[in-house]
Amino acid sequence: MEARGLACESSNSAVKAPSIEDFVLVKPISRGAFGKVYLARKKCNSKLYAIKVVKKAEMVDKNMTEQMRAERDALALSKSPFIVHLFYSLQTATKVYLVMEYLIGGDVKSLLHIYGYFDEDMSLKYISEVALALDYLHRHSIIHRDLKPDNMLISNEGHIKLTDFGLSKVKLDRELNLMDILTTPSLVKPTKDYFRTPGQVLSLISSLGLNTPVIEGKRHSSTVLGSPMSCGKVKQRNRSLGSPLMKRRAEYMNSPVCTSRALASNSVFSPVLLARSLTPRLLKSGKRLDTMSVGSTHSCMLPSTTDSENCVSPMWEDEQNLHDVENIPQLNGREVDNRKSRNVPLTPVEKRKTLPARAQDHRPVFTPLNNQVTNSRNIKPDLSAKRLQFGATDNSATPLEKTVPHQSVGNGLIKPEPLKELKSSVKRAFEEVEKSPEQAEILFKKNDAAYERSFQIPEKTSRAHTGLTGIFSIVGLDDVKSAPKCQQFNERTGPKQSSPIAVAKNLFCELEDQGEEGGKAEPNSSSSTSPGDERNIRRSLSLESDVSAHEMSLVANTPQKLSDAKQEVLSSSFEELDENEISAVTPMARPTVATPKHSSAKQRRGECERSLLDHPHGLSDSMIKSPGFLKPKNVVAFRSYCSSINRSCTSHLSLASFDAMEMSASASFHNAVTPVQKKRPSLSNSLYQTPQQMVVSHTPYRTPKSVRRGPERVEGAPILGTPDYLAPELLLGKPHDFMVDWWALGVCLFEFLTGVPPFNDETPQLVFQNILNRDIPWPDGEEELTLNSRNAIEILLTMDTLKRAGLKELKDHPFFDGVDWENLHHQTMPFIPQPDNETDTSYFEARNTAQHLTVSGFSL
């Protein structure tokens, strides 16, 4: 088979490298948190493969690009009989394809649903093989971090192979190279089972291309939540074709700037002129991305939205380009150049030939343009009421004509000067900016001194981006019993302008009404608590908050979905998933810690009216204990310990980095209350806190280390895993290592023997409490576990990581007596798949059915 694969590849190697076009799709297999898995066949032979398809845009939006690389690297480096083999890592402009071996036996979770639970011998063999796989990974500096029955596949012979390394951690601070693939330390002389063709090796060491211009724009807009220029850009991208320019022209015709109405709208919007204006801009987009100063202040405040595929105009286009190249009317009502408005547009070939000549004409046109801009601002100072870009400037602002000679027209270097020109080029109208009062303060800044203080955000601006509150006004919060606190909050704060406080006031009134309509069965949900009790609550909750699932993605797509603040935007995200699919994702949504990274503790102590955004959420002790606080939505797919066989379906989807889950998933879990942190005043009256991040960061909602409890967290260690299988050190905010996998193995052993995870409960909060309290419901009576099996579980589920068992301790344990560790892959397995044919995927259907997952779609 391998010889045929090599011959097939060698015959085409002179033509092209391996491509996804070399495969033919057979059928879908399953669906996970980040993509779908398909059964496919290679065109040149009959060998079957399992292809995992992941969209690049989704990984960028979820801040999971590093995890995508980690999964590919972990599979490429692993050459073990107990780990799924990766053949190819292919990609297109929008998707990544991991071509792996197809294991026809399905996953252990499906088998567990069918069996109910495994007997002791069956559990012993499965756990032994998984233990060897974990030991192999740990010796190669790979932490799986998502070990669960769902990610254990059964081969044709019935053996176990680990898969789904999407949450793994690989200690490889560089790109894979040829030697990493060919010389795995444990296999100096690789056997033919791990032989890779040249095309396979080439695909495995290639870059995943997650930093393309299209994706880069999305990366900035997803992470720079606090940037005043990033809000509302979704509209510009959705309407793509020069949207800010088209709006500007239309508003210009209706504004006082246009003293004469001589120019007809069709003379500006003609298709000929539109095509003429876009061509040179697109030619420049690639060069601009290559030369932009990444470390500059303005790169952070004004991230690139250049998207060559969507024809989005760059935010830093200079004044001359917008008026000369695009033939936009001057601010005083005159045309830029009557000759150019009458010229016949050039073809793309002619434009490229004449481009140097056009570039030489930039400077002569620049000076009169700036004079016109300056004069128009002096003549009409009252335009701030109509348009943001013509607002009043600082008296110390440098005139534009003084900065023009320093502007480099031919390149894309970003300097402070172009920001001044920006105000009269592509700024949107006042009524188009959702958060106008807050953004106006930054938009009016014109001098260098103002931008030297760019990270010291004004008070109103820091409260402008409301993150979560916009979501809760759309998603029903039936169980929120906080109407008195909301009413008190509204009475204390009431600015008349369109500010975040007013917005929050309206939103909390809606929550108040919904809370009253949702029932009054929880009289204990009072808001009167002594300061001492609140400190205890904050302490207990902060222990569960930091490095656990609490840093989930309640804010994953916030900049894109909340910029419009319309129900249509969010409702469309829910329409993509039916109720069953939402129920499969919902258990991943959990409380978040969403405090800004660059705010000090002193800044967080403020007036009571600032509690909506700057303070965490105070919760009374009775509220935490009340059934209403812990009551899940109907779609939350958690089962009780005493329910039927399907009760253990809580572990179905891998929880991504909890800074990066989809908004639809997190919004569907309405009980997500943010835990209270240390060093916070007790006068916080809001139940939800909105992040106010203002700088580019891969983890923008990370709590400042100054308020963390426990040891300082290791750098670059996001919170990953599935609720039932999370180790306590993750919930306690401590640095974690490979011992988290051994904890998860103990959870799996308990689940194999009983049919349900040991810490399973109705809500994620209760699951976390069970883990931290090590509350294990041991079966009794006829279902009681043997002493050896129970002790094996206990040494794996040890709270102290230094005392937790590993492979060495398991080999010496009485429960594993008689296990031939050196020949596990030759032992007879208790279950051997008997498929109807080679394309049979029925062994995967049990888990899909139990978790209400529907797999559809046949497009790669």
From Swiss-Prot:
The active site is at D146 (proton acceptor). GO terms for cellular component: centrosome; cleavage furrow; cytoplasm; nucleus. Coiled coil: none annotated. The keyword Cell cycle applies. GO terms for molecular function: ATP binding; protein phosphatase 2A binding; protein serine kinase activity; protein serine/threonine kinase activity. Its EC number is 2.7.11.1. GO terms for biological process: cell division; DNA damage response; G2/M transition of mitotic cell cycle; intracellular signal transduction; mitotic cell cycle; regulation of mitotic metaphase/anaphase transition; thrombocyte differentiation. Disruption phenotype: Morpholino knockdown of the protein results in reduced number of circulating thrombocytes, distinguishable at 3 days post fertilization. This is Serine/threonine-protein kinase greatwall. It comes from Danio rerio.
